């Protein structure tokens, strides 16, 4: 119980346990899910509203600070603003009531000092007066002090940087009621050290008297300079230990920011998620600041600058990171289960967010409540010095941070998941297109792999927030969202100067917020300690009660007397150049009111332009707001075979295909065909046209396609049916193909849209193939069922027995030693010398770099690894080896080879080169070759397992030494005697072919993929077995992997499609699985062969009375194993 009251940062991992959620947790989680659900249903609305609210808040802050100084500059006119100089002053009382100790009092306005000696103590700082290149600061006697003012110099107080500063200082004390007159008199001090005789001389100008001479641009610069000067003064009068602590605090805060970005990068977001977390924190700060100041709690910049770094470091960004990890994990889990769930139970993006909130929401709220409670306790404490005020502000910041986490940030996560879905869709589609698949088929496959599933339509558009968009709109969407937010705020900031200062009264909610930027009260003892000591001695000796107002230091700068140019600046009109007009308008010197500013032609055009941009932006954002994610209401339907393409939901008009309907004439049918209305003809009419040669057999699918009449699946199925009839009735072959039309070859209920243009032509149906699973087999710590499509009995059972033995020894371990598909074109040259020159150039660094750049430019996935050349007469063979991502990659690499050869012929001086063939059998593809066995092709994998001796005897019914001897004599010596290349195994091809057929691989590549050497040895009484397969050619996208049944098997193995973060990992994992399955098959067959009773066991336990096929070593081996098992059980 006590552990639950500790925040997550302080709890150990062991303290978290899965228990039944209590009543409070269920209620809190339900509220959070409801809030986040409403926010995510309208993501654009949520983001825009919150961003505009935050913009309004900080515009109020700036309107009361930065631009107030800009407006006020027009009222200075070279005069001293005494009230401005007095801001930040502190009052100190000394007398009997304070036991003759300095006591800090409240502001001057709230005190009555009648009958008290009220003095003012001011310090003048002359910038750079001690530097060699500058004039000397004036002495105290050189100041133009009025005759009726009794200002007396007192010792000034040095600061931390005084020993190496170039500034000099003077301090004066005088009666407080003489301060305005005194400051106005000393706003300009002559420079007595100047040697200038002619013209205007420089003077020491008080900082407050410099504003109006520079127009609006100068006023803004003045504000920035004042802010920087205040910061420097604060540093100068701070203690060393305070500076060290604050420096460490700010360093820690920025390290927290860096840690946030690294954490989000590990979760898959390089920038945007971390940036939105920071935006959410800034919004929470603005809202908390608004509420705090509205409630009358005084907050200033000094308090914020000292407290915020430690608040950021203490609270951190753990909660957004935890929620992000939970949402992304839930999305990945839902996506993984999407292929196994029925259409009525498919999870959506919102379901992922709801699941994450259900798992982590209550714990996050609990942590917020604990932290807020601690801050409330700090705010209620009696500790002075700003702690109470900052704790009050921090509690509100955390409250709004919690609210924004489950509204603003969950909306951002919803958009992130949507963008991730679009990226997966586009990546898969482009990878399929690069592998040679048509755009339409690639789009269908990518749509069927989408999560959540979207309607597959024949277009190049994708869905975002329920609306179809082009793929190129994704990046534009992100840029417009961010750019739009920035633009709205730029317009807000830029229009502030055009608002009348009286407008502040119309925003009472923001009236107190501007006080945040008011000058921070100074520490009088750090600024004027020596002067106070002098006053103390005088007051104590006279026993006179004294109040001293310590005025913040006033800076002087040596420059020409700008106050004299103020009058000239006031006389400027709109007749001068437009640039000056605009700057004066921004500064507020010409604008008397908003109405007057609109009358100016330049300003009015600027306002109209800003208004136009705002309207365009709002139109885009609120049009995008209609893209809200809405969950479709899905009525429960009975279980039925799932079809990936959901186009059949559309209702189509019925067409009359009754064979008894009178047939149209041939001329009418041809007219329908020319009008591209052939789909309206009956089947018999279409068969007749095809037999007469009017419709080519390969064009039936294209002819049948009519989206207004039927779906593509139905049209293609009809095309297959018609083609079967055409083949059966073709006069030249009807004697032997006549039975095809009514044969048992199935053709219905198959998605031919994935076949057309990708896998097969002239389709007349599909062949069902028995599919079994072997295993489970543990591979690198993960258990798999191995899908195997075969017509050879007991092959799956044999592999399963090997898997059982391997699992008993701890599973198989695999190592990937190479990954690179190859293509070996043949090029010819007129002479041997030219061919040799080309070989030397390709083998050089220059040739390799040029060909690599050309090759890599053709694909986002293909990356050239190695070039190998061989010369045969005037023919040059070049073997390109490259990575191909998760595709098997033959088409992808062929495009790269063509591009590289073109660049070599046209740009590298080999224009006499002739490309004989893009494939010169130097690859080598679909043929047994020593080059594949030595250099590898595709994935090179080694799989190993250690089988305990007792498992060999009990499960495999064999002996370790017998297995080792059999492997040496059969697989090694026997294959060598036969002159085999890569055939040093028992039956690797059996398993490779079965897995290839089940997972949509190219069965013809079984030739080189089955190259394998099996090794065995006795390791301390245990059997160590390994298979080395240097050329496994597999892919998880493209080819037959796009078919529904085959992709389901890839899904079962967890390697379907392209890997989301590291392209190529899925294909490499499939190669590991194939090698481990071969290892299991090799172990089982060799064990059965080593048993020595194959013939007797096969004859005794053969279940087929009549011979239906020739027995194989596998069937005999597994039958022998069954016989031995049955015998032992008896």
UniProtKB/Swiss-Prot annotation:
Catalysed reactions, as listed in the record: (R)-mevalonate + 2 NADP(+) + CoA = (3S)-3-hydroxy-3-methylglutaryl-CoA + 2 NADPH + 2 H(+)
Comp. bias (Low complexity): 1103-1122
Organism superkingdom: Eukaryota
Domain SSD stretches: 242-415
Keyword Metal-binding in annotation: no
Pathway membership: Metabolic intermediate biosynthesis; (R)-mevalonate biosynthesis; (R)-mevalonate from acetyl-CoA: step 3/3
Entry's induction text: Expression is induced during iron starvation.
Signal sequence coordinates: none
Residues that coordinate or bind NADP(+): 859-861, 886-894, 1102-1103
GO terms for biological process, alphabetical: coenzyme A metabolic process; ergosterol biosynthetic process; isoprenoid biosynthetic process; N',N'',N'''-triacetylfusarinine C biosynthetic process
Annotated spans, Disordered: 1103-1130
Places the protein is found: Endoplasmic reticulum membrane
Stated family: Belongs to the HMG-CoA reductase family.
PANTHER family the UniProt entry points to: 3-HYDROXY-3-METHYLGLUTARYL-COENZYME A REDUCTASE
Misc remark: Mutations of Phe-262, Ser-305, Pro-320 or Ile-412 are associated to acquired resistance to azoles, clinical drugs used to inhibit the activity and kill Aspergillus fumigatus cells during infections.
NCBIfam families: HMG_CoA_R_NADP
Name of protein: 3-hydroxy-3-methylglutaryl-coenzyme A reductase 1
High-level lineage: Eukaryota, Fungi, Dikarya, Ascomycota, Pezizomycotina
């Amino acid at each position: 119980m006590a552990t639950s009251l500790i925040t997550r940062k302080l709890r150990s991992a062991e303290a978290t346990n899965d228990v039944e959620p209590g009543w409070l947790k269920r209620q809190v989680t339900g509220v959070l899910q409801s809030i986040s659900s409403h926010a995510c249903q309208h993501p654009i609305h949520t983001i825009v509203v919150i961003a505009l609210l935050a913009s309004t808040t900080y515009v109020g802050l700036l309107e009361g600070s930065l631009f107030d100084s800009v407006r006020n500059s027009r009222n200075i006119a070279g005069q001293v603003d005494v009230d401005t100089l007095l801001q930040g002053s502190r009052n100190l009382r000394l007398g009997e009531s304070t036991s003759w100790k300095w006591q800090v009092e409240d502001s001057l306005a709230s005190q009555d000092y009648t009958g008290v000696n009220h003095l003012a103590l001011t310090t003048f700082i002359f910038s750079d007066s001690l530097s060699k290149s500058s004039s000397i600061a004036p002495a105290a006697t050189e100041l133009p002090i009025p005759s009726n003012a009794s200002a007396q110099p007192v010792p000034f107080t040095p600061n931390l940087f005084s020993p190496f500063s170039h500034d000099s200082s003077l301090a004066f004390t005088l009666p407080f009621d003489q301060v305005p007159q005194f400051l106005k008199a000393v706003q300009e001090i002559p420079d007595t050290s100047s040697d200038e005789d002619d013209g205007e001389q420089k003077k020491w100008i008080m900082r407050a008297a410099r504003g109006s001479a520079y127009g609006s641009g100068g006023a803004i610069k003045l504000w920035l300079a004042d802010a920087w000067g205040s910061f420097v003064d604060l540093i100068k009068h701070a203690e060393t230990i305070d500076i060290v602590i604050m420096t460490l605090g700010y360093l820690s805060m920025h390290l927290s920011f860096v840690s946030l970005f690294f954490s989000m990068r590990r979760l898959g977001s390089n920038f945007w998620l971390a940036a939105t977390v920071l935006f959410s924190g800034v919004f929470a700060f603005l809202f908390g600041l608004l509420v705090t100041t509205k409630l009358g709690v005084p907050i200033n910049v000094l308090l914020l600058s000292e407290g915020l770094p430690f608040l950021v470091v203490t609270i951190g960004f753990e909660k957004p990171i935890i929620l992000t990890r939970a949402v992304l994990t839930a999305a990945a889990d839902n996506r993984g289960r999407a292929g196994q769930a029925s259409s009525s139970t498919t999870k959506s993006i919102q379901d992922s967010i709801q699941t994450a909130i259900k798992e982590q929401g209550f714990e996050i709220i609990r942590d917020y409540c604990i932290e807020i409670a601690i801050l409330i306790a700090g705010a209620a404490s009696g500790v002075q010095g700003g702690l109470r005020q900052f704790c009050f502000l921090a509690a509100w910041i955390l409250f709004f941070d919690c609210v924004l986490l489950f509204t603003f940030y969950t909306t951002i996560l919803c958009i992130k998941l949507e963008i991730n879905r679009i990226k997966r869709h586009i990546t898969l589609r482009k990878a399929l297109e690069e592998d040679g698949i048509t755009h339409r088929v690639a789009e269908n496959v990518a749509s069927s792999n989408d999560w959540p599933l979207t309607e597959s339509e024949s277009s190049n558009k994708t869905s975002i927030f329920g609306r179809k968009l082009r793929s190129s709109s994704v990046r534009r969407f992100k840029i417009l969202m961010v750019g739009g937010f920035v633009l709205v705020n730029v317009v807000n900031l830029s229009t502030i100067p055009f608002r009348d200062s009286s407008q502040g009264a119309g925003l009472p909610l923001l009236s107190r917020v501007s006080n945040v930027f008011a000058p921070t009260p100074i520490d009088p003892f750090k600024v004027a300690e020596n002067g106070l000591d002098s006053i103390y001695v005088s007051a104590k000796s006279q026993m006179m009660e004294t109040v001293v107002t310590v005025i913040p230091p006033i800076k002087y700068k040596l420059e020409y007397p700008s106050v004299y140019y103020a009058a000239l600046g006031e006389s400027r009109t709109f007749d001068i150049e437009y640039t000056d007009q605009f700057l004066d308008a921004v500064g507020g010197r010409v604008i008397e009111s908003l109405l007057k500013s609109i009358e100016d032609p330049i300003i009015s055009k600027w306002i109209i332009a800003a208004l136009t941009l705002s309207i365009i932006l709002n139109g885009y954002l609120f049009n995008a707001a209609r893209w809200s994610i809405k969950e479709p209401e899905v009525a429960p339907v009975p279980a039925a075979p799932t079809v990936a393409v959901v186009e059949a939901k559309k209702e189509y008009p019925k067409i009359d295909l009754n064979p008894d309907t009178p047939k149209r004439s041939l001329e009418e049918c041809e007219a329908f065909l020319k009008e591209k209305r052939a789909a309206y003809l009956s089947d018999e009419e279409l068969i007749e046209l095809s037999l007469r040669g009017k419709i080519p057999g390969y064009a039936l699918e294209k002819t049948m396609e009519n989206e207004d009449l039927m779906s593509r699946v139905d049209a293609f199925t009809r095309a297959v049916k018609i083609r079967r009839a055409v083949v059966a009735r073709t006069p030249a072959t009807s004697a032997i193909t006549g039975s095809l039309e009514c044969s048992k070859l199935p053709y219905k209920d198959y998605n031919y849209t994935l076949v057309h243009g990708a896998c097969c032509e002239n389709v007349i149906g599909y062949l069902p193939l028995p599919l079994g699973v072997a295993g489970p087999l543990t591979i690198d710590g993960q258990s798999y069922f191995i899908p195997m499509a075969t017509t050879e009995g007991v092959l799956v059972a044999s592999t399963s027995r090997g898997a059982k033995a391997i699992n008993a020894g701890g599973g198989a371990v695999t190592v990937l030693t190479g990954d690179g598909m190859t293509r070996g074109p043949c090029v010819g040259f007129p002479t041997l010398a030219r061919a040799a020159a080309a070989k030397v150039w390709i083998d050089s660094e220059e040739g390799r770099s040029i060909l690599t750049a050309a090759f890599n430019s053709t694909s986002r996935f293909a990356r050239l690894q190695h070039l190998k050349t061989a010369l045969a007469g005037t023919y040059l063979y070049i073997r390109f080896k490259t990575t191909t991502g998760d595709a098997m990659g033959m088409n992808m690499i062929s495009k790269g080879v063509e591009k590289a050869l073109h660049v070599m012929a046209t740009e590298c001086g080999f224009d006499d080169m002739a490309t004989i063939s893009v494939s010169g059998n130097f690859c080598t593809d679909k043929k047994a070759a020593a080059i594949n066995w030595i250099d590898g092709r595709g994935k090179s994998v080694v799989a190993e397992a250690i089988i305990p001796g007792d498992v060999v005897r009990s499960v495999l019914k064999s002996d370790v030494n017998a297995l080792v001897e059999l492997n040496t004599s059969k697989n090694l010596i026997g294959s060598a005697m036969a002159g085999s290349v890569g055939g040093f195994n028992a039956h690797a091809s059996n398993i490779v072919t079965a897995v290839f057929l089940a997972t949509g691989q190219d069965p013809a590549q079984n030739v080189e993929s089955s190259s394998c050497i099996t090794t065995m040895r006795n390791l301390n009484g245990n059997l160590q077995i390994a298979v080395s397969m240097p050329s496994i050619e597999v892919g998880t996208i493209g080819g037959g992997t796009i078919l529904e049944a085959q992709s389901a098997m890839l899904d079962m193995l967890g390697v379907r499609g392209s890997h989301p973060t590291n392209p190529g990992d899925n294909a490499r994992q499939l190669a590991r699985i194939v090698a481990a399955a071969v290892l299991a098959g090799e172990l089982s067959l060799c064990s059965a062969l080593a048993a020595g009773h194959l013939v007797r066991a096969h004859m005794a336990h053969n279940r087929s009375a009549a011979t239906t096929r020739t027995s194989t070593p596998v069937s005999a081996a597994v039958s022998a194993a069954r016989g031995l098992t049955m015998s032992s059980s008896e």
